[in-house]
Amino acid sequence: MRRLWMVMGVLVFLAPLLRGQGPRKFELRANAQEFWKLVGHDARLTQVAAGFGFTEGPVWDPAGFLYVSDETLNKIFRVHLDGKRDTLISLGDPDGNTFDRRRRLIDCASALRAIIFVSTDGRYHILADRYEGKRFNSPNDVVTGPDGALYFTDPTLDLPKGEKQEIPFQGVYRLSRTGKVLLLTKELVQPNGLAFSPDGQRFYVDDSDRRNILVYEFTPGRGLSHGRVFGEEPGGTGDGVPDGMRVDAAGNLFVTGPLGIWIWDAHGNHLGTIVMPEQPANLAWGEADYRTLYITATTSVYRLRTNTRGFIPY
């Protein structure tokens, strides 16, 4: 969602200065003791790599590196833990990524208005680019569901300049392994990040326009039902909006939002916030035990070791 963040990213750094404060610093803000069970008092944030345009869509590869989208430089990079990077593919406005059950890298290709998979040789293949004959808006984020299908959001946040919106709403969709596209909901203004609970019975999606997170009951073969507001992430101008999300194995929700990463328990209690020096857009669990958060935040990629284990849906 580069278009929104190009404006907000500038405000993130200007707003503190206008208030007479210095640039934002890493900080742990707990609202409940449970926060410290997930993020230790001695947690340290490390900058893995810098010098990007706008980072998004981190995915950990068990080979020991990250795939990271850069929406400004129009590339998907392999980012190594020593900070080095190499280009997997040059692609207009890549966004959220995931692996599917076949371990293929799946990307929301906003400029193509499509869901694609990118092979290890840097070639891409379109999996879906239309719903009922009309082109998607600008697919934003994608996850693998408990049934092995792909689930993705399609806001207008990165609709290519000069191109028309063909679908008259911003939807959340299911893409089956046979290529069938099913609309799940069109009630959100700008759907963005999404995730499933570890037991596969809950589906979370945030709305960047309304600054809230919704939760639905999920039933394979039936889709979503009983949607309700799970939590809200209010913030000031330039503080950021709800964006990427991940869950841990215990069902806690980690959502990038105003000032940093908001942590919620499964009951909708806001346990605390990890304040970031740069506004984060997305995050992923990584390393052999999946206890490390890798965070894409504007021009950098960061690493934060936690006390919890991430849930990996593929």
Residue ranges and their predicted role:
Residues 50-65, 90-114, 132-150, 166-171, ...:
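Beta-rich, blade/repeat-based domains predominating
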Residues 33-50, 82-90, 119-133, 171-190, ...:
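Blade-edge beta-strand/turn elements of extracellular beta-propeller
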Residues 66-87:
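Beta-propeller domains
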Residues 216-223, 306-312:
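Short loop/turn segments immediately following beta-strands, especially the blade-tip
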Residues 75-77, 114-116, 170-173, 212-214, ...:
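A short loop-to-beta-strand structural motif that recurs across blades of beta-propeller domains
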Residues 71, 110, 155-157, 208, ...:
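Short loop/turn segments immediately following the C-termini of beta-strands
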Residues 152-167, 306:
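Short, conserved, GDST-rich strand-edge loop motifs in beta-rich repeat architectures
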Residues 22-46, 166, 312-314:
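Blade/loop signatures of beta-propeller domains
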